[in-house]
């Protein structure tokens, strides 16, 4: 009876850890996107080049690095995958080079996040109809060697009509995979476990996660047990008749909250709501940074522990510039996300190409020194057109905006630790230290 009780307790402990992951661990993360849209063009291989920058990335207090899609792909960037086990066909480098890069990050205590593209797949061959729908896995024992029956039946351009209907948004450029098919679930789960056990990845970034249901994502997360998951659920803001974002974006952030709750475990989502509001707010509309309840207006206002904040990525910024942050205001975005709740994500370009490394590192150091984490307490002290001021954990105060005179908002026992054009960060200290010149 004692052994049975011990076994039961052990099972319950594992279940509890799955349902309520280590909050402290989740809250101390800084994610770094380690590539841009054109990284595949790097002579000598991106993996090899990035390996030389591991030390610089670690110096910013980064805990997780997001790496590009590692597999064979019809498109050089990796987002039109085909042979999923073939890591030597990647434009970023070979499998051996990838494993060496991951080992270098692990040696610095940084976990590696794979860009997982499984909503759709590109086939190697045509079937008898002349349709590209014969897939090759490039791996052991015919794994991931599929035919048209593994495609969603409503993707009529490629499917033979025998699969299930798509559980998410359509992806027109390639066959949408039937994620309700048991063989698909089993073999993709095996592949995800292989990425962790054989290649060394610790977590995932789920590309185009709107393409399949949260229930499907939950299945893969439960089967493969990554330590970190962040989903790309790119939802548009609501806009008023004047073309500007509406003041209320509750519907947008609710979609993100719903997804992470339905997936559970370590699942988080990129906070597209905060990005959209913030990049409008820094253009003379900082009043947007406080919602009707006095909280942050994005996902971090409702569920910060599960929100990954960012300024730009390979899609929104880089050379694609699909939804870019104003170029002259980028550092204001970092002043916000690196001192606020949520898990901040730093973009490669801004550190290594935009000459913002020193300022970003100073903000990241402030975050680490004061223990700011995903669940930190935020108090918005002011949100007006030309000034936003907030206190985090009663230890750090951030001011964004061109207004120089902030009145009596800043207590006398706070001193400046980071500042630049239109932003300033104060830190509480028992001993008042001299303020840098140019207090803002």
Curated annotation (Swiss-Prot):
One of its GO terms (biological process) is sucrose catabolic process. GO terms for molecular function: alpha-amylase activity; calcium ion binding. PANTHER family: ALPHA-AMYLASE. Monomer. Binds 3 Ca(2+) ions per subunit. Keywords: Calcium, Carbohydrate metabolism, Glycosidase, Hydrolase, Metal-binding, Signal. Ca(2+) 2 binds at residue 145. This is Alpha-amylase isozyme 3A. InterPro entries: A-amylase_bs_C (IPR012850), A-amylase_pln (IPR013775), Alpha_amylase (IPR006046), Glyco_hydro_13_cat_dom (IPR006047), Glyco_hydro_b (IPR013780), Glycoside_hydrolase_SF (IPR017853). It comes from Oryza sativa subsp. japonica. It is an enzyme of class 3 (hydrolase). Coiled coil: none annotated. Important for breakdown of endosperm starch during germination. Residues 1-26 form the signal peptide. Ca(2+) 3 binds at residues 155, 170-171, 174, 176. It holds the Pfam family Alpha-amylase. The gene is AMY1.2. It catalyses: Endohydrolysis of (1->4)-alpha-D-glucosidic linkages in polysaccharides containing three or more (1->4)-alpha-linked D-glucose units.
């Amino acid at each position: 009876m004692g052994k049975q009780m011990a076994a039961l307790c052990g099972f319950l402990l594992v279940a509890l850890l799955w349902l309520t992951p280590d909050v402290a661990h989740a809250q101390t993360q800084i994610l770094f996107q380690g590539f841009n849209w054109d990284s595949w063009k790097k002579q000598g291989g991106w993996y090899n080049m990035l390996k030389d920058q591991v030390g610089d990335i670690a110096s910013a207090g980064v805990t997780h690095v997001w790496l590009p899609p590692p597999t064979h792909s019809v498109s050089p960037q990796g987002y039109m995958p085909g042979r999923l086990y073939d890591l030597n066909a990647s434009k970023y480098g070979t499998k051996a080079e990838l494993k060496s890069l991951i080992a270098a990050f692990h040696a610095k205590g940084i976990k590696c996040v794979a860009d997982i593209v499984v909503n759709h797949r590109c086939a190697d061959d045509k079937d008898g109809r002349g349709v590209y729908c014969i897939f090759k896995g490039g791996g052991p024992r015919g794994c991931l060697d599929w035919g048209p029956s593994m495609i969603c039946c409503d993707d009529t351009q490629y499917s033979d009509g025998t699969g299930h209907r798509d559980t998410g948004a359509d992806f027109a450029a390639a066959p949408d995979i039937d994620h309700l098919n048991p063989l698909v679930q089993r073999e993709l789960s095996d592949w995800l476990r292989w990425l962790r056990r054989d290649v060394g990845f610790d977590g995932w970034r789920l590309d185009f996660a709107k393409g399949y249901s949260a229930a499907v994502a939950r299945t893969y997360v439960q089967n493969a047990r990554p330590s970190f998951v962040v989903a790309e659920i790119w939802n548009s803001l609501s806009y008023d008749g004047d073309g500007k974002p509406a003041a209320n974006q509750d519907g947008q952030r609710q979609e993100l909250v719903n997804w992470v709750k339905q997936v559970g475990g370590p699942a988080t989502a990129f906070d597209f709501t905060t990005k959209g509001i913030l990049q409008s707010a820094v253009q003379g509309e900082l009043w947007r940074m406080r919602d009707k309840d006095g909280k942050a207006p994005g996902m971090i206002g409702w569920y910060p522990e599960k929100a990954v904040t960012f300024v730009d990525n390979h899609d929104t910024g880089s050379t694609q510039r699909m939804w870019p942050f104003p170029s002259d205001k980028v550092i204001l975005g970092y002043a916000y996300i690196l001192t606020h709740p949520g898990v901040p994500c730093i973009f490669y370009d801004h550190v290594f190409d935009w000459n913002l490394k020193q300022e970003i590192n100073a903000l990241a150091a402030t975050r680490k020194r004061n223990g700011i984490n995903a669940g930190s307490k935020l108090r918005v002290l002011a949100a007006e057109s030309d000034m936003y001021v907030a206190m985090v954990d009663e230890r750090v105060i951030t001011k964004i905006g061109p207004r120089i005179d902030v009145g009596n908002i800043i207590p006398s026992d706070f001193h400046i630790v980071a500042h630049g054009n239109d932003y300033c960060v104060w830190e509480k200290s028992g001993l008042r230290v001299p303020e840098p010149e140019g207090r803002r």
